Amino acid sequence: MLETPKVLLKNLQDCKIHFIGIGGIGISGLAKYLKAQGAKISGSDIAISPSVKYLKALGVEINIPHDPKAINHQDVIIHSAIIKEDNKEIQRAKELKIPILSRKDALYSILKDKRVFSVCGAHGKSSITAMLSAICPFFGAIIGAHSKEFDSNVRESANDSLVFEADESDSSFLFSNPYAAIVPNTEPEHLEHYGHDLERFFFAYEYFLDHAQKRVIYKEDPFLKSYSKDAIVLEKKDIYNIQYILKDGEPYTSFELKDLGAFLVWGLGEHNATNASLAILSALDELNLEEIRNNLLNFKGIKKRFDILQKNALILIDDYAHHPTEISATLKSARIYANLLDTQEQIIVIWQAHKYSRLMDNLEEFKKCFLEHCDRLIILPVYSASEVKRDIDLKTHFKHYNPTFIDRVRKKGDFLELLVNDNVVETIEKGFVIGFGAGDITYQLRGEM
């Protein structure tokens, strides 16, 4: 199924690598990791982002926007999946006969000699990767989100072992060289990449699992339930005595796992206990049980995943959930958190759908996912993520929520302003607000745009 890339990164020391789309979370992670390995990094993107600012602070030269003049005899060009053949920098690299790699192809070179704990699934992979990196602090880590433990999406280590968040959206997880394949779920998404062929989609997961020496799976998933090869298996019944507490004002889940005793992990919800359990089971051959138990406490959450931005008169949470399953699970966590805080405030949801294709593919589930634990729904325009706009009558589809439609939300001090046509139509000064989406809602809620 895999074709080995014709261009391989060999000696990284002083290798000149240019990243097109360097601001993306996946590409920026590779750029940080390779810079730490001794490579000379440059890059470009269409706009300034936190990742771009971070890399510039490290001394990386970055062009905004893309500029063919930035291509000047680098050893290799690596580009994100969203970059097309007609990109000016791609065209210039071809003129200069500089090797060009997609992120997917570059992964093969970067990971082929590593002992990779590769985490992949529709939901929970960032959290599991960050939890496992907390449990195994001597491992390197490349995560698709910022771990609050070390305030980055990358942790460099001389150790051959690496915790890696793999990506099924472009099938690049197949290039991650898994020593251990860790899969919490396989709910179909990104089917456009697989030609809307479910058989092809599930075959990719099977290939990923089959080519790992070690497999850790959650058998409540319909596909994983039928997986027949040797694996470390987690089932719902293996996790019990789940309780939720506030510790020093922070939310934690305590639970017992199989016959391994009790564990405590930052965050709330059954899904949080499941994610932590998969990380624990993945590490059993790496450390003793007490080290695992203690190191898990170093996990402090990840940016944009139940990210508590403030907790005063207005409790404000930012969450990356952009699929109905994720939204439903996180809303349950929000209700648990509200109960722990003993607040009587309504839970207000601000939702920014991410991609027209995802919204249309999951429309019926989106229409149901706010039914529990959402007292008021506020809807932002769809974040297209470069997709062509489609006409979707959200007012009709979501009328059963009596939603409020706005153009954007603006953080002003400790308050939130709701805007339509650049006019403030409402100010939220107190209450419990959670924002959902993988687009720019995170910057709106943080007052960064």
Swiss-Prot record:
What Gene Ontology terms describe what this protein does at the molecular function level? ATP binding; UDP-N-acetylmuramate-L-alanine ligase activity
Q: Name one GO biological process term.
A: cell wall organization
Q: In which pathway does it act?
A: Cell wall biogenesis; peptidoglycan biosynthesis
Q: Where in the cell is it found?
A: Cytoplasm
* Reactions this protein catalyses: UDP-N-acetyl-alpha-D-muramate + L-alanine + ATP = UDP-N-acetyl-alpha-D-muramoyl-L-alanine + ADP + phosphate + H(+)
Q: Which SUPFAM superfamilies match?
A: MurCD N-terminal domain, MurD-like peptide ligases, catalytic domain, MurD-like peptide ligases, peptide-binding domain
Q: Matching InterPro entries, A to Z?
A: Mur-like_cat_sf, Mur_ligase_C, Mur_ligase_C_dom_sf, Mur_ligase_cen, Mur_ligase_N, MurCDEF_pg_biosynth, UDP-N-AcMur_Ala_ligase_MurC
Please state the Enzyme Commission number of this protein. Answer: 6.3.2.8
Q: Give the enzyme class.
A: ligase
**Where is ATP annotated to bind?**
G121, A122, H123, G124, K125, S126, S127
Q: Output the Gene Ontology cellular-component terms.
A: cytoplasm
Does the record bear Zinc-finger in its keywords?
no
In which family does this protein belong, per the annotation? Belongs to the MurCDEF family.
Role, per record: Cell wall formation.
Q: Which HAMAP family match?
A: MurC
The molecule here is called UDP-N-acetylmuramate--L-alanine ligase
Q: Source species, please? A: Helicobacter pylori (strain HPAG1)
